[in-house]
């Protein structure tokens, strides 16, 4: 039987797309050249002496065929443009769905043989394959998206079963074939460094009998081997999941105070239940970074690389510290005037990256980049963001949406609104020297925080506060010009609607300048923490759904329980 274990699902539609697009474009250009040549030939060979200037009738008789030819040329060009821009992409999506479905049938039907495959192929319901990691409404959309009622789905996230300890730090990744999910199971209390185990699962989206999606768990592994993995981030890759964690042996504050880097681990979990873990060593980090932490939010698989969001502390006086210490990013709120001169505000913004509580380390965001060509690689690189384009280092999430790269950064510093960036770095030429990002201007949504960096803070100050609450862009957030607010930009998620306390979890949709629709729970004092949101579309019904994962306070079993909420989003 043929071995499908090395079959790359992504390569099929991409290769098909390139061939069809290039062929159509070349044919269109050739047609235009031929028609233009024909018209020019007709013009050049006009017999001017035969009476072109003699009478209006003769002029009209000569010009009219040219006009008709030009009309035909324009009509043909419009048809080619319509075919290339609309018809062909739709057909590609249809072909792609058929290919995925056929492959799934081969792996799950009579042709499947577990002795020569990496396990049964995981694949979402066909109605969802082409509705994932796409912009879900048009860029020109400027309406008010609203949430439908909570949908009663079976939870794919196991809860704590003991009053001691808690479950925390969810990370969720979704690609065209399957999803991956992980969280930390803290055994004694709910402190970051307490002894813990790690839960990791993968599964698929299925259509329920009630005509809405459910998340079916297909594979799970519970890592209870005595290794205290923390701050784990997950990424779905072809064939399975990748888990990136650091091993905690001391508190976060102690991690920043020392120069002895904690152990970093990269684990691969495949369809056939194979689990392979590597300890990774990053070049040019020892002696420069005090600590390196996975940034909790999910990573991405892009152009043969696995990318994870990272943050940590740079040691003063090192080359990395010196390179970044003069850089700072200072977004502006148009309706808020900050005290002090511009130079004073700039100085405050620059100093906001260095945190006294964390032994005066410079808090830095970065991306861990690992080639997937060696699927069990321990060869990874850490590439820093340019601090003149992003805020102080913090937890975050990476996205690939319509082949564009984006980055959410937790608002842990003085800017209280959600931080979302377009990544402009080109990975097609290999690992870059630095990550370039462009801020998506937005003054929503707030997060709770301590003074002087509470929920209404937009002026430079030195603090470390806030809470992780990633966003999901519903349409293209690209501004019309540099740092110009896009009035049509819409995004969704959940936030903690309180000035300073981690309470009152609330679902929202927002524009760059206003909350558009909010719905919460009856108890506005209910405790909560991290939130993570992922929206997608059923391309058959055209319905949009948002999966919103929230760490909800629990008074019975542990301090927190992680709950997945599913709602339809109505544009």
Swiss-Prot record:
GO terms for cellular component: host cell plasma membrane; membrane; viral envelope; virion membrane. It comes from the Viruses. Its main location: virion. It catalyses: Hydrolysis of alpha-(2->3)-, alpha-(2->6)-, alpha-(2->8)- glycosidic linkages of terminal sialic acid residues in oligosaccharides, glycoproteins, glycolipids, colominic acid and synthetic substrates. It holds the Pfam family HN. InterPro entries: Hemagglutn-neuramid, Hemagglutn/HN, Sialidase_sf. Keywords: Disulfide bond, Glycoprotein, Hemagglutinin, Host cell membrane, Host membrane, Host-virus interaction, Hydrolase, Membrane, Signal-anchor, Transmembrane, Transmembrane helix, Viral attachment to host cell, Viral envelope protein, Virion, Virus entry into host cell. Residues 1-25 are intravirion. Residues 47-571 are virion surface. Disulfide bonds join 166-190, 180-241, 232-245, 338-459, 370-380, 453-463, 535-546. It is found in: Virion membrane; Host cell membrane. GO terms for biological process: symbiont entry into host cell; virion attachment to host cell. Its EC number is 3.2.1.18. Attaches the virus to sialic acid-containing cell receptors and thereby initiating infection. Binding of HN protein to the receptor induces a conformational change that allows the F protein to trigger virion/cell membranes fusion. Neuraminidase activity ensures the efficient spread of the virus by dissociating the mature virions from the neuraminic acid containing glycoproteins. Homotetramer; composed of disulfide-linked homodimers. Interacts with F protein trimer. The C-terminus (head domain) is involved in binding the cellular receptor. Belongs to the paramyxoviruses hemagglutinin-neuraminidase family. This is Hemagglutinin-neuraminidase. It comes from Human parainfluenza 2 virus.
């Amino acid at each position: 039987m043929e071995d499908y274990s090395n079959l790359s699902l992504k390569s099929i539609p991409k290769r098909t797309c390139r061939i069809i697009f290039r062929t159509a474009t070349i044919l269109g250009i050739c047609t235009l050249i031929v028609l233009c040549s024909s018209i020019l030939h007709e013009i050049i060979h006009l017999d001017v002496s035969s009476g072109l200037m003699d009478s209006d009738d003769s002029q009209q008789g000569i010009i009219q065929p040219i006009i008709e030819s030009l009309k035909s040329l324009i009509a043909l060009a419009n048809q080619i443009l319509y075919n290339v821009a609309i018809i062909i992409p739709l057909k590609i999506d249809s072909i792609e769905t058929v290919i995925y479905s056929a492959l799934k049938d081969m792996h799950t039907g009579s042709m499947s043989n577990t002795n020569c495959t990496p396990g049964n192929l995981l694949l979402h319901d066909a109605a969802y394959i082409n509705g994932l990691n796409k912009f879900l409404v048009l860029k020109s959309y400027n309406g008010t998206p609203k949430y439908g009622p909570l949908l009663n789905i079976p939870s794919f996230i196991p809860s704590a079963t003991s009053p001691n300890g808690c479950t925390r730090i969810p990370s969720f990744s979704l690609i065209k074939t399957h999803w991956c999910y992980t969280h930390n199971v803290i055994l004694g209390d709910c402190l970051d460094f307490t002894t813990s185990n790690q839960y990791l699962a993968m599964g698929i989206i299925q259509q329920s009998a009630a005509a809405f999606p459910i998340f079916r768990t297909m594979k799970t592994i519970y890592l209870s081997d005595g290794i205290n993995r923390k701050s784990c981030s997950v990424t779905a890759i072809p064939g399975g999941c990748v888990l990136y964690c650091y091993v905690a042996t001391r508190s976060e504050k102690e991690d920043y105070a020392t120069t002895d880097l904690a152990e970093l681990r990269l684990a691969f979990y495949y369809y056939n239940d194979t689990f392979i873990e590597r300890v990774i060593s990053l070049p040019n980090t020892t002696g420069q970074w005090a600590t390196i932490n996975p940034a909790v939010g999910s990573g991405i698989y892009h152009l043969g690389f696995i990318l994870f969001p990272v943050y940590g502390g740079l040691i003063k006086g090192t080359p990395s510290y010196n390179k970044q210490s003069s850089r700072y990013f200072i977004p502006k709120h148009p309706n808020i005037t900050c005290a002090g001169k511009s130079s004073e505000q700039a100085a405050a913004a620059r100093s906001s990256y260095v945190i006294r509580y964390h032994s005066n380390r410079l808090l830095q965001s970065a991306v861990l980049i690992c080639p997937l060509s060696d699927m069990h690689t321990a060869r990874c690189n850490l590439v820093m963001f340019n601090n003149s384009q992003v805020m102080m280092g913090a937890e975050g999430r990476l996205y690939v949406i319509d082949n564009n790269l984006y980055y959410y950064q937790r608002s842990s510093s003085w800017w209280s609104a959600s931080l979302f960036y377009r990544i402009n770095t080109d990975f097609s030429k290999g690992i870059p020297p630095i990550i370039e990002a462009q801020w998506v201007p937005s003054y929503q949504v707030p997060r709770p925080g301590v003074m002087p960096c509470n929920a209404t803070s937009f002026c430079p100050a030195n603090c470390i506060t806030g809470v992780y609450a990633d966003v999901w862009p519903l349409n293209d957030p690209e501004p019309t010009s540099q740092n110009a607010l896009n009035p049509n930009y819409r995004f969704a998620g959940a936030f903690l609607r309180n000035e300073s306390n981690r309470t009152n979890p609330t679902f929202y949709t927002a524009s760059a300048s206003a909350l558009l629709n909010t719905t919460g729970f009856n108890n506005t004092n209910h405790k909560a923490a991290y939130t993570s949101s992922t929206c997608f579309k059923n391309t058959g019904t055209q319905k949009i759904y948002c999966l919103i994962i929230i760490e909800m306070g629990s008074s019975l079993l542990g301090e927190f329980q992680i709950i997945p909420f599913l709602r339809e989003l109505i544009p």
